[in-house]
């Protein structure tokens, strides 16, 4: 059965709202957006983060760490998923009988009166959301990553139209009130939330699509190709004449879409053209075609997605890909980029698996995803994301790559140091290196830890 959200009778934009865990990417996005909508915002977290600094600069009062004294006369408390019932601020809010909403429940109250372009899928949703927000600059945007166009995960706006990155991992996408539902793929993941029931998992996607007034789907997906209700459909054959270029040193994909002409979008790979095409098709009723074509050029990528950190003797790329399908697609992009640069360097991959559950569920696919375009594989310890450690013999499972196992990687100037037991065992001074993972590898590659 599908969950029913807790509903707050008051409009959140008229409320005093306290966010517990305000530094997280999801919660900070809601806080930034609601402040722009007129709400009075306060918050707390356990540590300073870039989002906390940004909100403080806007005048938002934020307590570090959590403090029950911060809870006084607010109309509602919104907390992130990791906040537990025994949190001191949660306990104080209960004493004062202040309504408490999880982020998931708050979504419905925030979005119920909005014209939401809701993007959901296993892969590509951050990119599509950022591309569509570039195409429609008057719309608000809440993205699960930082758009380089406006250097934030949120574009604050008083506009009722909103581009929103929805999340299937906790089924909160069902609370996103989609005016337009945009789905690139439905590859099963996060099945633990759906009790490993595929029927329940796909029913959630069907419900999401059914409740939108407008639907944009990629029909090469095995589930979406059988979706029967009216939808704007993208098929692989609709995208043609794909070419890759460097423009002012930056990578771009050129392609033609249906009978709409040629488009140019930042980034490389067929998947990049597919993501851009879904964003374009979603905007056809919003802007004229030339505005769409020109505005798409404002998309400059998103942080941690084929994020080119440096391009000198050592080309260094950070990518959030943490699923075999994503890794395989991004490695193809890396090979295209290497060819455009006319470098003869081999592609070195540093991989940090994210969550034992994902690694075990997709182990056979992980064992294959590096076969193409990876010349050397370096493996970091699994990033558990608070999961209980599980025994898995990575050396045995990945022996066909003859991988290098290290404890961590450290950025030092323009070089990378590989460490085992806090000893530097190798320094990479030149070449082509791409890091994959959704854990702390991004901070290791950036020299931030």
From Swiss-Prot:
Keywords: ATP-binding, Cell cycle, Cell division, Cell shape, Cell wall biogenesis/degradation, Cytoplasm, Ligase, Nucleotide-binding, Peptidoglycan synthesis. It holds the Pfam family Mur_ligase_C. Gene3D superfamilies: Mur ligase, C-terminal domain (3.90.190.20), Mur-like, catalytic domain (3.40.1190.10), NAD(P)-binding Rossmann-like Domain (3.40.50.720). SUPFAM superfamilies: MurCD N-terminal domain, MurD-like peptide ligases, catalytic domain, MurD-like peptide ligases, peptide-binding domain. One of its GO terms (molecular function) is UDP-N-acetylmuramate-L-alanine ligase activity. Its EC number is 6.3.2.8. ATP binds at residues 121-127. Pathway: Cell wall biogenesis; peptidoglycan biosynthesis. It is an enzyme of class 6 (ligase). NCBIfam families: murC. Cell wall formation. This is UDP-N-acetylmuramate--L-alanine ligase. It comes from Helicobacter pylori (strain P12).
């Amino acid at each position: 059965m599908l969950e029913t959200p807790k509903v707050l009778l008051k409009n959140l934009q008229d409320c005093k709202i306290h966010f517990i865990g305000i530094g997280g990417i999801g919660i900070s996005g809601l806080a930034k957006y609601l402040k722009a909508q007129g709400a009075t915002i306060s918050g707390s977290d356990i540590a300073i983060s870039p989002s906390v600094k940004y909100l403080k600069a806007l005048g938002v009062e934020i307590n570090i760490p959590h403090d029950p004294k911060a809870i006084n006369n607010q109309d509602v408390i919104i907390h992130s998923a990791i906040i537990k019932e025994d949190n001191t601020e949660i306990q104080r809010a209960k004493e004062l009988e202040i309504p408490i909403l999880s982020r998931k429940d708050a979504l419905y109250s925030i979005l119920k009166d909005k014209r939401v372009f809701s993007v959901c899928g296993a892969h590509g949703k951050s990119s599509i959301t950022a591309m569509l927000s570039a195409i429609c600059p008057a719309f608000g945007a809440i993205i699960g990553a930082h758009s380089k166009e406006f250097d934030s995960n949120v574009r604050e706006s008083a506009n009722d139209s909103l581009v929103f990155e929805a999340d299937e991992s906790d089924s909160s996408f069902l609370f996103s009130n989609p005016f337009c539902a945009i789905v690139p793929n439905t590859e099963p993941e996060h099945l633990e939330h759906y009790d490993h029931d595929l029927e329940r998992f796909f029913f959630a996607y069907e419900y999401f699509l059914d409740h939108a007034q407008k639907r944009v789907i990629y029909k090469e997906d095995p589930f979406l190709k059988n979706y029967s209700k009216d939808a704007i459909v993208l098929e692989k054959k609709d995208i043609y004449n794909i070419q890759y270029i460097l423009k002012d040193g930056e990578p771009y994909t050129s392609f033609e879409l249906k009978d709409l002409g040629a488009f140019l979008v930042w980034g490389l790979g067929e998947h990049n053209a597919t993501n851009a095409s879904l964003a374009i098709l979603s905007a056809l009723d919003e802007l004229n075609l030339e505005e769409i074509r020109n505005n798409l050029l404002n998309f400059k990528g998103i942080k941690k997605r084929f994020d080119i950190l440096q391009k000198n003797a050592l080309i260094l790329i950070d990518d959030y890909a943490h699923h075999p399908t994503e890794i395989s697609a991004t490695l193809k992009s890396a090979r295209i980029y290497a060819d455009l640069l006319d470098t003869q360097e081999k592609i070195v991959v540093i991989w940090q698996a994210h969550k034992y559950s994902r690694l075990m569920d997709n182990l056979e696919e992980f064992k294959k995803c590096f076969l193409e375009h990876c010349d050397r594989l370096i493996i970091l310890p699994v990033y558990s994301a608070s999961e209980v450690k599980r025994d898995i013999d990575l050396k045995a499972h990945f022996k066909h790559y003859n991988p290098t196992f290290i404890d961590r990687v450290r950025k030092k100037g323009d070089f990378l140091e590989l460490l085992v037991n806090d000893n530097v065992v190798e320094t990479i001074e030149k070449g082509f290196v791409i890091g994959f993972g959704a854990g702390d590898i991004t901070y290791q590659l950036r020299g931030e830890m």
